[in-house]
């Protein structure tokens, strides 16, 4: 199916099959479509609402074309990632949580990018922390094997995305591509926490990941609108485990934590996010640093559970709490900076 035929179908509010979507996505990602066609396709899909079959087709093509990171084993390797677009401008919770996971001995293959609508994307934060981002897939694998954590800079692994960059930027709206990033981890992880910008996406994206072979995934959205677990409100979870999907709400109190406002956790820049994370991961914390630490513990705990590194969400949160307060997570961030600095010298020689 070509993109013109697909547009005719979409205008008629008809869904594409998985295979038809694969054909259209391959044309988009290999530069066979004009920017006008891509923009029309993305808007048409949004107006119609993307089906599970369509998302599966799009994800499978992006995964196929990605520059992959080959790991010795994917057992218990986890990614904690959000779609962004929640408008809250909270500090980089998922990225900070990743260092707690690594300090707990749980390997992390973190996939992320620069901010699109927010103040600080994961790549922006890590760059502010002095971590070199432009790694080869082999270098990322060496980071994960040696340190238990590596960062995959999305634009380095999904170069085919460049064909859709112009239309996405000019539309300035959330499109299908906002959902695809968290579903296209270049290391092919089977364990994830995926935060989404709307509760209505939780179940569908859990079903997409089920069809694509994921093992244990939590797809989450909090009642106060975050694409992660919140301290200030219940969080809705669609959990894929043992090839079954269950849906439920989680309150901070269910996990042994106290509900509190998120006041003081919004940031205006990657540097401000880094300062708050340094405060949160350090041994002596300000009031905002303590609150940020609890937000990190909540989300790192969920990822420890998704990685099967803890038997329950509550056990994951307890482990994350213990690890964060050792100060080892901040040391892990500094180790990654030193480790990638060597690769920077190699790559720029």
UniProtKB/Swiss-Prot annotation:
Q: What class of enzyme is it?
A: transferase
Any one of the GO BP annotations: L-tryptophan biosynthetic process
Q: Which GO terms describe its molecular function?
A: anthranilate phosphoribosyltransferase activity; magnesium ion binding
Keyword ATP-binding listed? The answer is no
Task: List positions binding anthranilate 2.
Answer: 168
Sites binding Mg(2+) 1 sit at: 94, 228
Listed InterPro entries? Anthranilate_Pribosyl_Tfrase, Glycosyl_Trfase_fam3, Glycosyl_Trfase_fam3_N_dom, Glycosyl_Trfase_fam3_N_dom_sf, Nuc_phospho_transferase
Q: How is the cofactor bound?
A: Binds 2 magnesium ions per monomer.
List positions binding Mg(2+) 2.
Answer: 227-228
Listed cofactors? Mg(2+)
**Pathway where this protein functions:** Amino-acid biosynthesis; L-tryptophan biosynthesis; L-tryptophan from chorismate: step 2/5
Q: Which residues bind anthranilate 1?
A: 82, 113
Catalysed reaction(s) here are: N-(5-phospho-beta-D-ribosyl)anthranilate + diphosphate = 5-phospho-alpha-D-ribose 1-diphosphate + anthranilate
Q: Can you tell me which residues bind 5-phospho-alpha-D-ribose 1-diphosphate? A: 82, 85-86, 92-95, 110-118, 122
Q: Which UniProt keywords apply?
A: Amino-acid biosynthesis, Aromatic amino acid biosynthesis, Glycosyltransferase, Magnesium, Metal-binding, Transferase, Tryptophan biosynthesis
Could you say which EC number(s) this protein's record lists? 2.4.2.18
Q: Any one cellular component term from GO for this entry?
A: cytosol
- Give the multimer and partner information: Homodimer.
Matching PANTHER family: ANTHRANILATE PHOSPHORIBOSYLTRANSFERASE (PTHR43285:SF2)
Q: What does this protein do?
A: Catalyzes the transfer of the phosphoribosyl group of 5-phosphorylribose-1-pyrophosphate (PRPP) to anthranilate to yield N-(5'-phosphoribosyl)-anthranilate (PRA).
Q: Which family would the database say this protein is a member of?
A: Belongs to the anthranilate phosphoribosyltransferase family.
NCBIfam families, A to Z: trpD
- Protein name as it appears in the record: Anthranilate phosphoribosyltransferase
């Amino acid at each position: 199916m070509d993109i013109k035929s697909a547009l005719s179908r979409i205008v008629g509010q008809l869904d594409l099959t998985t295979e038809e979507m694969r054909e259209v996505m391959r044309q988009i990602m290999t530069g066979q479509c004009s920017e006008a066609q891509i923009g029309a396709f993305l808007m048409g899909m949004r107006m119609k609402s993307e089906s599970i079959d369509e998302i599966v087709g799009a994800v499978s093509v992006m995964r196929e074309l990605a520059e992959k990171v080959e790991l010795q084993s994917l057992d218990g390797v986890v990614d904690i990632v959000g779609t962004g677009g929640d408008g809250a401008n909270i500090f980089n919770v998922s990225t900070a949580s990743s260092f707690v996971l690594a300090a707990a001995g749980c390997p992390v293959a973190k996939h992320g990018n620069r901010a699109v609508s927010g103040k600080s994307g994961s790549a922006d934060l890590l760059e502010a922390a002095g971590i070199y981002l432009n790694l080869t897939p082999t270098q990322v694998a060496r980071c994960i094997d040696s340190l238990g954590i590596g960062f995959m800079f999305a634009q380095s692994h999904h170069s085919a995305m460049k064909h859709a960059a112009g239309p996405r930027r000019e539309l300035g709206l959330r499109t299908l591509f906002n959902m695809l990033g968290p579903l296209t981890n270049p290391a092919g992880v089977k364990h994830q926490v995926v935060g989404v910008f709307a509760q209505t996406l939780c179940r569908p994206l859990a079903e997409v990941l089920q069809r694509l072979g994921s093992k244990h995934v939590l797809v989450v959205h909090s009642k106060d609108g975050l694409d992660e677990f919140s301290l200030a409100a219940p969080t809705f979870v669609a959990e894929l485990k043992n090839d079954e999907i269950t849906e439920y709400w989680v309150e901070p109190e269910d996990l042994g934590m106290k509900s509190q406002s998120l006041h003081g956790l919004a940031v205006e820049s990657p540097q401000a996010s880094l300062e708050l994370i340094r405060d949160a991961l350090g041994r002596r914390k300000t009031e905002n640093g303590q609150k940020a630490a609890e937000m990190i513990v909540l989300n790192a705990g969920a990822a420890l559970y998704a990685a099967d590194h803890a038997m329950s969400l509550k056990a994951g949160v307890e482990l994350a709490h213990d690890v964060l307060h050792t100060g080892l997570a901040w040391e892990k961030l500094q180790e990654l900076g030193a480790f990638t600095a060597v690769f920077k010298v190699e790559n720029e020689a």
